[in-house]
């Protein structure tokens, strides 16, 4: 199976490339790494060009503009990168018979749920910020493209999802002429999988654990406690684990539909921060604050918990605590190296 990964230089992209290199179904040539400048979200021709040149059987779209505050400041750019770029890619995929795995986010939900249940794919999405709106528009664009050209957006026989985006949003901007010269592989209807995840972390740096450790160091130097939000709750997800979950889908051969793939469990930002500091033996007290106390362009959903969907192997992702235990040595080495410098 020839698999291409967009955003191959990013957090999830790197994890996917590493996992695919060891996967038995990718063959001797290995995965295709699409990244800038060859694949650029701002380039309307990038999808057609990359598919025509490399002829993948599956594209995993991990590229996105994930700067949530930037999306709030520049919502038109957010739509360009997270919706129109998806529309162009989905159109190119379905016209060439290429399967598409679209990575999306918990922020398609507004987080106002009060029953302490995780969001399922059957729950109707309702974004509460421009980033979530742009990602939901991307989901809708991909579904519209696949529905419009005979692709599969559900596993055969699967019940319909009331929460699936309809035919609206950015898909209308896709030109039928965009796929001129595309390779065609019509042996089977191409599949679309939408994979939503949450609170992604892992190498290379600048994730929540790295930032909380840096903030704790500054607080300790100032002799102050660390203030962390206590009423934002979610599902921390380790990028290598998410990559393995996506490969689980691909290995099954039949993966169309909406999937929620996160490490099991839920935790507040403050308690996750405490867990990180304890694991790295950093003794700085955390004082809980509220989301309302922070002023920023984008407001994250207070309840970001996704209910994991069953993977084809039957094995869900492990609890977030076990996943973080594998990341802890990486953080420890980085901190030790920074101290020596």
Model-derived features: where do they sit?
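N-terminal Rossmann NAD(P)H-binding glycine-rich loop of SDR-like oxidoreductase domains
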Residues: 1-22
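Adenosine-cofactor binding site in Rossmann-like domains, unifying the SAM/SAH pocket
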Residues: 27-49
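NAD(P)H-binding glycine-rich loop region in Rossmannoid oxidoreductase-like domains
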Residues: 41-81, 92-94
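Glycine-rich NAD(P)-binding loop of the Rossmann-fold in SDR/ketoreductase-type enzymes
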Residues: 42, 73-88, 125, 129, ...
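Conserved Rossmann-fold NAD(P)-dependent oxidoreductase catalytic core, especially the SDR/UDP-sugar
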Residues: 87-130, 150-156, 171-180, 185
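NAD(P)-dependent short-chain dehydrogenase/reductase
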Residues: 143-154, 182, 186-234, 241
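Mid/C-terminal beta-alpha module of Rossmann-like enzyme folds, strongest
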Residues: 224, 245, 252-297, 331-341
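C-terminal amphipathic/interface module of NAD(P)-dependent oxidoreductases
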Residues: 282-284, 299-341
């Amino acid at each position: 199976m020839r698999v291409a990964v967009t955003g191959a230089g990013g957090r999830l992209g790197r994890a996917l490339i590493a996992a695919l290199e060891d996967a038995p179904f990718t063959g001797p040539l290995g995965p295709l790494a699409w990244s800038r400048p060859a694949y650029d979200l701002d380039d309307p021709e990038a999808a057609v060009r990359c598919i025509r040149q490399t002829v993948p059987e599956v594209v995993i779209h991990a590229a996105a503009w994930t700067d949530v505050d930037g999306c709030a400041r520049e919502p038109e750019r957010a739509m360009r990168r997270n919706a129109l770029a998806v529309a162009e890619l989905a159109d190119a995929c379905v016209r060439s018979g290429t399967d598409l795995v679209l990575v999306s986010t918990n922020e398609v939900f507004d987080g106002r749920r009060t029953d302490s249940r995780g969001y399922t794919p059957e729950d109707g999405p309702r974004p509460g910020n421009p980033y979530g709106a742009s990602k939901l528009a991307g989901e809708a664009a991909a579904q519209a493209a696949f529905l419009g050209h005979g692709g599969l957006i559900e596993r055969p026989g699967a019940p319909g999802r009331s929460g699936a985006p309809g035919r609206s949003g950015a898909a209308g901007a896709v030109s039928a002429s965009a796929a001129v010269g595309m390779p065609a592989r019509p042996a089977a209807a191409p599949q679309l999988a939408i994979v939503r995840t949450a609170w992604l972390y892992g190498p290379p740096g600048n994730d929540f654990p790295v930032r909380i450790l840096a903030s704790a160091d500054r607080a300790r130097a100032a002799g102050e406690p660390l203030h962390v939000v206590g009423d934002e709750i979610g599902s921390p997800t380790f990028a290598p684990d998410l990559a393995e979950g996506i490969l689980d889908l691909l290995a099954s051969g039949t993966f169309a539909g909406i999937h929620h793939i996160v490490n099991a469990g839920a935790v507040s930002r403050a308690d996750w921060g405490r867990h990180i500091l304890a694991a790295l033996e950093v003794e700085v007290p955390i004082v809980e604050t509220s989301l309302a106390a922070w002023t920023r362009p984008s407001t994250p959903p207070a309840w970001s918990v996704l209910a994991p969907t069953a993977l084809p192997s039957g094995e869900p992702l492990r609890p977030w605590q076990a996943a973080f235990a594998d990341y802890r040595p990486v953080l420890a080495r980085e901190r030790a190296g920074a101290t020596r410098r």
